[in-house]
Amino acid sequence: MARRNRGVTRRERPNLLITGTPGTGKSTTASALAEATNLRYICIGDLVKEKEFYHGWDNELECHFINEDSVIDELDDAMIEGGNIVDYHGCDFFPQRWFDRVVVLRTENSVLYDRLTNRGYSGTKLSNNLQCEMYQVLLEEAHDSYDEEIVTELQSNTIEDISNNVSTLTDWINAWQP
């Protein structure tokens, strides 16, 4: 439950954003972290599909154009309350006030290539995602969108990396003070 202190709502539990290029392990990391910490896991892609928060389809990239305002309206109360782990491949449209930690997962391109081709990515979609990772687009987006001190970059190449990341983030959540 969120507390009010001099008109300012303070969360009892932190909110984290787990972001990165598709295939970097966001969903695996975020769901394992939610299980380890009893925080709520919110996959934006699933929410968009479930609530139909989209307007059209991008044939070239094979994805929906999401209605960002609908996503924000849907999640605002939960984010004010706190205790959420949000999983999404972008971060620039979320309000800065929502997050106490923004985690950008990074993966070597050879590993990412294998993961994405195993998912059936090809052509422009595969190429765009590999370039996005190579040029650190999501890391730059996070640094441009949030205070430097809350942005963390973690490597996510192996199962061991993911396990270590979950452990590190669990420790951070357990030590977090509102």
Swiss-Prot record:
InterPro entries the UniProt entry points to: Adenyl_kinase_AK6, P-loop_NTPase
Region (Disordered), start-end ranges: 1-28
Residues given in the record as ATP binding sites: G23, G25, K26, S27, T28, R119
Keywords, ordered alphabetically: ATP-binding, Cytoplasm, Kinase, Nucleotide-binding, Nucleus, Ribosome biogenesis, rRNA processing, Transferase
Gene null: resulting phenotype: Decreased stem growth.
EC number: 2.7.4.3
Location(s) in or outside the cell: Cytoplasm; Nucleus
Catalytic activity, as annotated: AMP + ATP = 2 ADP; ATP + H2O = ADP + phosphate + H(+)
GO biological process: developmental vegetative growth; ribosomal small subunit biogenesis; rRNA processing; unidimensional cell growth
Pfam family, one: AAA_18
Cellular component aspect of the GO annotation: cytoplasm; nucleus
GO molecular function: adenylate kinase activity; ATP binding; ATP hydrolysis activity
Region spans: NMPbind: 43-66
Chain spans, region LID: 118-128
Primary enzyme class: transferase
The protein's assembly and partners: Interacts with small ribosomal subunit protein uS11A/RPS14A. Not a structural component of 43S pre-ribosomes, but transiently interacts with them by binding to uS11.
Chain's role: Broad-specificity nucleoside monophosphate (NMP) kinase that catalyzes the reversible transfer of the terminal phosphate group between nucleoside triphosphates and monophosphates. Also has ATPase activity. Involved in the late cytoplasmic maturation steps of the 40S ribosomal particles, specifically 18S rRNA maturation. While NMP activity is not required for ribosome maturation, ATPase activity is. Associates transiently with small ribosomal subunit protein uS11. ATP hydrolysis breaks the interaction with uS11.
Protein name (Swiss-Prot/TrEMBL): Adenylate kinase isoenzyme 6 homolog
Species for this entry: Arabidopsis thaliana (Mouse-ear cress)
Taxon lineage: Eukaryota, Viridiplantae, Streptophyta, Embryophyta, Tracheophyta
